[in-house]
Amino acid sequence: MEKRENPYLRYLRRERLPHIFCAGCGNGIVLNSFFKGMEMAGIDFDNIAMVSGIGCSSRIPGYVNCDSLHTTHGRPISFATGLKLGNPSLDVVVFTGDGDAAAIGGNHLIHGARRNIDMTVICINNSIYGMTGGQISPTFPEGSYGSTAPYGALEDPFDLAELVTAAGASYVARWTTAHPLQLANSIKKGLKNRGFSFIEAISQCPTYFGRKNRMRSPVEMMRFMKENSLNRRKALKMEPDEVEGKIIVGEFANRPQPELCEKICSMVDEKSGRALDMIRSAYRDD
């Protein structure tokens, strides 16, 4: 029987395989959903520029055969902003994680959303610092265990989708790795949106989060995410105590609005035109 090849292998740098991700990591699922969403959106792969910071998920662009920037910790959105302003015709995609985006990069995240600059940010949220030993991140669930929370986390976690929605992003969605088709569809919408798009992918880290919280199997973790998810449309009609502890998934914002690059270009055209009119007027007066 002929072995079928994954159709998305053509987008990868095969010479860099095998990857460094742990067995059962959700990064591969998210990348697969990205390729599917990209094809559904009709985006030209050669026009994509990927940007990432530091963390497990930030290693993803290194395996993708496109132009990419591997930047400093917490700064991928800043670099992506400069890239987009320098060449507005590019389709800029940021791969980041919960630590990279919500901790050291938190200010850059909310201001990127506020500016509504055209880029698609895919945040793989596994609630943990997986490259440095399993320290807890700003999205770590209260009461769960990590290497820096041996008796259980005491802090309330960030709700990234709600945070970015409040900051002004024009498209925001959240799914889990147990919802790959829905995730791909939201990535498609994010890529087609003219503005700041934020897609949060709740993912499993069996190596650190799973072992510390008695969910050693990736399948067990994904089953938990699937069974514990609740669509936002339904959640909005329920009482707060009914949705407590649930993973709220779905679209949080889909509101087209003026994009920063377009506003800058319009301003330049307007001001340049006025300057030329003033020069012509001066010559006519002479």
From Swiss-Prot:
SUPFAM superfamilies xref list = Thiamin diphosphate-binding fold (THDP-binding)
Against CDD domains, the record matches this protein to: TPP_OGFOR
- Matches recorded under InterPro entries: 2-oxoacid:Fd_oxidoreductase, THDP-binding, TPP_enzyme_TPP-bd
GO biological process assignments: organic acid metabolic process; sulfur compound biosynthetic process
Which top-level group of life is the source organism from? Archaea
Gene3D superfamilies tied to this protein: 3.40.50.970
- Protein name in the entry: 2-oxoglutarate synthase subunit KorB
Species name for this entry?
Answer: Methanothermobacter thermautotrophicus (strain ATCC 29096 / DSM 1053 / JCM 10044 / NBRC 100330 / Delta H) (Methanobacterium thermoautotrophicum)
